[in-house]
């Protein structure tokens, strides 16, 4: 899902097709309220809830394997950037709210959009074959690239992929609509050669084409209402931010042996029901 999110973010950032210092500063200001502020508030909320839980449950830690009361000033800062560097933590290089690594990387990419625009604007004036070959070559080469906390090569490439359509003022749905099966077969081929980012590119084409066809069919049938309940649409970001708390509760219940699967069927049911529980509780709290 994350490559698609970066793709859409790039398309929206450059939706005007133009770029200027004033527009750049305006977009950064808007994203300070839509990305940075929620980012800080949610991570601070998680820190508060974890400190309360650690006070209630002695010798208990979650997400970070170090008691919050033992945090140094650096540890507190790392919670907002990369918890893998807190003590012997290791693991994924993400902030305390682990899914927020996407927001962190997106904010960093937004800072570099003047450079991204210059490169893509140059490519937009070249033959389209050059842009296509360069993009696929970079996606293939990215399998050997080292990601830095806050700067994802995958994120940068798919953000640029979406941005390219906006800068060139081409509707990507018009380009991708007839490529449904081509995108799927390409994704399968990329999966077979173990190149995840090329696979994601194919899946984006397949998903956009399929979704466009479904919506067009609904429009022809005069079913213009969006097929998802409004409550799910309105709570999307809250579910994205909150579901890790519910997941932590489920994992704690399993680790403490409160719920123990006795066979493979029960384990499978727990696996299937967990995301349903996370969604239901998150939407309910919202």
Predicted regions and their residues:
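Alpha-helical transmembrane segments and their immediate interhelical/interface regions
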Residues: 1-28, 187-196
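Transmembrane alpha-helical segments and their boundary/interface "anchor" motifs
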Residues: 2-4, 18-79, 90-91, 181-182, ...
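Specific transmembrane alpha-helix
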Residues: 2-15, 104-118, 138-174, 198-220, ...
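Hydrophobic alpha-helical segments with transmembrane-like composition
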Residues: 5, 14, 35, 46-58, ...
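Membrane-helix interfacial "entry" motifs
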Residues: 19-27, 31, 90-94, 98, ...
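Membrane-interfacial loop-to-transmembrane alpha-helix junctions, especially the N-terminal start
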Residues: 23-31, 125-132, 173-182
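Alpha-helical transmembrane segments of multipass membrane proteins
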Residues: 42, 46, 50, 109, ...
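Alpha-helical transmembrane segments and terminal signal-anchor/GPI-anchor hydrophobic tails
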Residues: 151-160, 167-273
């Amino acid at each position: 899902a994350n490559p698609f999110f970066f793709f859409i973010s790039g398309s929206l950032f450059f939706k005007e097709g133009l770029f200027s210092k004033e527009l750049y500063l305006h977009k950064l200001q808007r994203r300070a309220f839509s990305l940075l502020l929620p980012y800080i508030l949610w991570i601070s909320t998680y820190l508060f809830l974890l400190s309360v839980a650690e006070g209630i449950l002695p010798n208990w830690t979650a997400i970070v394997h170090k008691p919050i009361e033992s945090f140094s000033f650096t540890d507190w800062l790392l919670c907002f950037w990369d918890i893998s560097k807190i003590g012997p933590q290791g693991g994924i290089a993400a902030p305390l709210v682990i899914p927020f690594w996407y927001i962190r990387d997106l904010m960093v990419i937004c800072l570099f959009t003047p450079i991204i625009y210059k490169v893509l604007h140059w490519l937009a004036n070249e033959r389209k074959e050059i842009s296509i070959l360069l993009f696929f070559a970079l996606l293939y080469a990215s399998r050997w690239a080292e990601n830095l906390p806050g700067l994802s090569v995958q994120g940068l490439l798919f953000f640029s992929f979406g941005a390219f359509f906006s800068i060139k003022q081409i509707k990507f749905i018009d380009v991708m609509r007839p490529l449904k099966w081509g995108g799927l077969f390409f994704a399968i081929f990329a999966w077979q050669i173990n190149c995840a980012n090329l696979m994601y590119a194919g899946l984006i084409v397949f998903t956009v084409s399929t979704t466009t066809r479904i919506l067009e069919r609904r429009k022809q049938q005069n079913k213009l209402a969006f097929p998802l309940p409004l409550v799910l649409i309105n709570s999307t970001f809250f579910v994205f931010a909150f579901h890790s708390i519910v997941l932590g509760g489920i994992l704690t219940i399993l680790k403490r042996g409160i719920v123990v699967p006795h066979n493979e069927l029960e384990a499978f049911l727990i696996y299937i029901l967990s995301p349903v529980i996370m969604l239901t509780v998150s939407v309910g709290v919202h």
